[in-house]
């Protein structure tokens, strides 16, 4: 694997592999990168501190479920690097509004704020966490616009 420097962070150099979608299986605590019908990478993940069920409101500690897209990348994340997920979508916003609440937002795939990953209980506010080495790889492989499907 080749490497490139970016904002003082060493990133793996992109390969010819095109990630066509991301699938998250919350119960299994796994995230899969697909190229067509082939799984090209699999990662152990941590989720929101209250992971059961779909995220409905700001502060509920749940990781969303449903179909979203990767909508941004952040090289200056508190959690090493981060990749934005397009939560909330219009359905999420509508449901929260009906209940008189905010749906929350700023849901990301990210690394940790530690030099290495502590395998611990789910700890994020609703995000999907991987190790810092893994987020460097994911950050370089995944493009803005990539679909992400988050399953229970």
What residues fall within each predicted segment?
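Short, conserved beta-strand segments within well-ordered enzyme catalytic domains
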Residues: 23, 32, 69, 84, ...
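A short, polar/charged loop/turn motif at coil->beta-strand junctions and beta-hairpin connectors
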Residues: 18, 39, 64, 77-79, ...
